Amino acid sequence: MVICNAIIVLLLAFNTLANPILPSSPNATIVGGQKAKAGECPYQISLQSSSHFCGGTILDEYWILTAAHCVNGQTASKLSIRYNSLKHASGGEKLSVAQIYQHEKYDSWTIDNDIALIKLQSPMTLDQKNAKSVQLPSQGSDVKVGDKVRVSGWGYLKEGSYSLPSDMYRVDIDIVAREQCNKLYEEAGATITDNMICGGNVADGGVDSCQGDSGGPVVDVASNQIVGIVSWGYGCARKGYPGVYTRVGSFIDWIDSKRSQ
């Protein structure tokens, strides 16, 4: 998720912001959550260069869904993924990346269209307890206010931390109205587009994704569908600023077109 220490900074009105709004950095974690148990988030992968820097979601044996800002400037030959493990640095299996597909209209300024696909060189072995694909929603589908979604990853456990947990964490959060979220972020100079969804505890804060969780899954608990991708926010779990996620339902046609190539 993009936060104060993220790589991509929206230089929106420097004098009006105490802290800049940023895409979730490649080193974020879950705030206010708990350690994931075996089988709870089997679709989660760790995207790695020399080590973990972003999350991703298993779509099938060859394809991974992640955030565009995670792969911005990256070269496929230097990337790998680890799957089938609750730890980002050990266990499971590592596979090399064959190709990166970043959305053509990704905007690093507004962080709109923050979605990318990764194709692997060799297939994953799925249908294991910690290695399963997730379902995609239909094109144009949207979340509803109050829907419960699960966010997972290896990001920082609190804002300002500089140490990644070795274990995967997860947290369940509620979807916040897009209109309400936009009003909150307008004051900070940012815009919530129709390609974004928001989630968290607006009144009290305390639960959110953070640096290092970027690119990871936001899954509807009831349907087990991937409805969001960890994208950006103002700090981590701050009161009055829910996390912002890519709305996957806006991009199903794009996903299908890339996977059919």
Swiss-Prot record:
Residues 30-260 form the Peptidase S1 domain. One of its GO terms (cellular component) is extracellular region. The active site is at H69 (charge relay system), D114 (charge relay system), S214 (charge relay system). Disulfide bonds join C54-C70, C181-C198, C210-C236. Residues 19-29 form a propeptide. GO terms for biological process: proteolysis. Its EC number is 3.4.21.-. The record marks D208 as: Required for specificity. One of its GO terms (molecular function) is serine-type endopeptidase activity. Residues 1-18 form the signal peptide. Keywords: Allergen, Disulfide bond, Hydrolase, Protease, Secreted, Serine protease, Signal, Zymogen. SMART domains: Tryp_SPc. InterPro entries: Peptidase_S1_PA (IPR009003), Peptidase_S1_PA_chymotrypsin (IPR043504), Peptidase_S1A (IPR001314), Trypsin_dom (IPR001254), TRYPSIN_HIS (IPR018114), TRYPSIN_SER (IPR033116). It is found in: Secreted. It comes from the Eukaryota. It holds the Pfam family Trypsin. Transmembrane segments: none annotated. PANTHER family: ACROSIN-RELATED, HYALIN. Belongs to the peptidase S1 family. This is Mite allergen Eur m 3. It comes from Euroglyphus maynei (Mayne's house dust mite).
